[in-house]
Amino acid sequence: MTTQLQHARGGTVTDAMERVAERENRDAEFVRQQVADGQAVIPANHGHDALDPMIIGREFATKVNANIGNSEPASGPEAELQKLHTAVHYGADTVMDLSTGGDLDTIRTENIAYSPVPVGTVPIYEAVTRVDDASDLTPELLLDVVEKQAEQGVDYMTLHAGVLAEHLPLTDGRTTGIVSRGGSILARWMEEHGEQNPLYERFDDLCEILAAYDVTVSLGDGLRPGSLADASDAAQFAELDTLGELTRRAWDHGVQVMVEGPGHVPMDEIADNVERQQDVCDGAPFYVLGPLVTDVAPGYDHITSAIGATEAARAGAAMLCYVTPKEHLGLPDAEDVRDGLAAYRIAAHSADVANGRPGARDWDDAVSEARYAFDWRRQFELALDPGRARNYHDQTLPEDNYKEARFCSMCGVEFCSMRIDQDAREAGDGMDGLESRTDLDSSAAAAVNRPPTGVHRAEKLDDIPCPVAEDDVAADD
């Protein structure tokens, strides 16, 4: 079957491109050209029937990925579906199922059956569970797992094909070594076998499988820095050069490509990292994990990384992989998913505003106008997380009459600056009254930059419990 890239190169605007154009408020021909040039991807496996197509590229609204998945000690299929529902509810544009234990096939196929957003995987995780030791992996097993997951409907796969044997000595002086799970597994395999990375050696065979199902390849950064001390080092950039080569090889097979990036990077190096990737990989969409801008805040790494993610997106990164408060500490639950997504939706939206995306600031202006008008219900309705906003307000002023009040508990009646400003404008002749001017219904913004958060067509998920906090229920009353 033909891939989105092959269709685009042939001049065909597909149904998926039409849907993307609608969601992005862009011309369908522009979408087609971006895909044809490899500057954007539409991850859309032919077998993912529940998918509502979306696009990832620097010329479009910044997207956010949420990692879900279990580990051997924790979480089963039902809990993972609840995480999926939570992720979509709070605005994930894609999800990655990173499960490493339990019934992997059931978890994966259930996620794909219910998910309206693209589902990504890291196939080497399943491959490792099918052998006694990682050193027992074979190229044939890796190809078999990739093909099986493609048949199941996976939309994009992370393949750490750029970690080469000659790169490994470059990590010797690092502080935290190789922190990518896939990268470390392959490094050990190469060391024990004295052979080259099998994902690199069999990359053309892998691309043939991916093209058959239109699976987008996400070229993994197996040598990404896991600490500020290791950022922008020789190992990271040697792998990046290989990823540039692999990008062009995948394109030759008609496979859509995005490239993954760090990691942990000081703030002043982030823009240079993004620009380098865009140059080396010929503009293929950059998909970054954070990056974290400091290593001192375990428990708050959704914040340390969202700071870096904002800068990365401002510089041209196309998709941000969220980090939850549990990063480096444990497996996230549904509430951690909520917190991580809030941080990253803020990062993505802030970058889109900074980059002047059409209509992106309209949402901000509408909230500000509702705030100035003391229209509390409208503020809650427009908020990124309506339940959280209403809950915080009602903790101190719970009665309904306070929804009409011209103050909150921060300043009280006498010291509310906006109330004082309004009174001054009404009393004198020197200042005119202020009026609301923003019409979100006519905004040129992409869907992800307009409320409500979580705008995917998700009818199938209605059958799955969503473990949202009680304050969400209150906000909907």
From Swiss-Prot:
Disulfide bonds: none annotated. Residues 427-477 are annotated as: Disordered. Its EC number is 4.1.99.17. Pfam families: ThiC_Rad_SAM. The keyword Metal-binding applies. Zn(2+) binds at H264, H328. This is Phosphomethylpyrimidine synthase. Residues 427-440 have a biased composition (Basic and acidic residues). It catalyses: 5-amino-1-(5-phospho-beta-D-ribosyl)imidazole + S-adenosyl-L-methionine = 4-amino-2-methyl-5-(phosphooxymethyl)pyrimidine + CO + 5'-deoxyadenosine + formate + L-methionine + 3 H(+). One of its GO terms (biological process) is thiamine biosynthetic process. Its cofactor is [4Fe-4S] cluster. Catalyzes the synthesis of the hydroxymethylpyrimidine phosphate (HMP-P) moiety of thiamine from aminoimidazole ribotide (AIR) in a radical S-adenosyl-L-methionine (SAM)-dependent reaction. It comes from Natronomonas pharaonis (strain ATCC 35678 / DSM 2160 / CIP 103997 / JCM 8858 / NBRC 14720 / NCIMB 2260 / Gabara).
